[in-house]
């Protein structure tokens, strides 16, 4: 295996505000494009990289991204492992930042009964859930969730699985019965074994 990590646009405040806040309002699509472009550049530079066998994995927010990646670029990624992914940020914990990245503020000017103008504000989450992407998905996705995950409720993974089933898509899924958000002990060993097997 060749394993890389990509630093996405918006990943550090050290390069200025415009760079750091690049992803506000869309936390998913631009990092996927960054990953794909970086892999394509590396494959062009190094002939030993097989661009026809590209996989992606991630946990938590990374699980959200790996499932998004194989659904967004189904002809580029041949395998993905998504563990404990927050696939639907509409049901994510309110205290975690991901739910706020895609908040859309709408300002409307209205007149009251005396003709005085006032502004009203409404807010909505605009990051689409991964379920909306399954129509593009072709093959190669393996999902994991901890049955006792207190950080990213298993409902995230179950909603994605339900959408995949309804769309008649082929995928794999494991629910680790004794796992919370992190996988430890025998559950971690099982997860790692199945992930390596999936990518081999």
PLM feature segments, named:
Residues 5-200:
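Active-site-proximal cap/loop segments of hydrolase catalytic domains
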């Amino acid at each position: 295996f060749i394993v890389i990590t990509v630093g996405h646009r918006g990943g550090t405040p050290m390069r200025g505000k415009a760079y750091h806040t690049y992803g506000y309002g869309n936390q998913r699509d631009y990092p996927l494009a960054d990953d794909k472009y970086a892999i394509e550049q590396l494959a062009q530079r190094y002939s030993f990289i097989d661009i026809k066998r590209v996989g992606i994995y991630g946990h938590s927010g990374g699980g959200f991204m790996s499932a998004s990646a194989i659904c967004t670029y189904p002809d580029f990624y041949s395998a993905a492992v998504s563990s404990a992914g927050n696939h639907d940020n509409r049901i994510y914990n309110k205290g975690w930042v991901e739910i706020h990245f895609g908040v859309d503020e709408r300002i409307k000017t209205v007149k009251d009964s005396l003709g005085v103008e006032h502004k009203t504000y409404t807010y909505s989450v605009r990051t689409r859930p991964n379920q909306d992407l399954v129509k593009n998905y072709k093959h190669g996705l393996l999902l994991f969730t901890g049955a006792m995950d207190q950080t990213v409720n298993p409902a995230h993974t179950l909603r994605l699985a339900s959408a995949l089933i309804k769309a008649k898509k082929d995928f794999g899924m494991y629910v680790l019965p004794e796992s919370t958000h992190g996988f430890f002990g025998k559950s971690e060993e099982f997860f790692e074994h199945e992930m390596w097997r999936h990518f081999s």
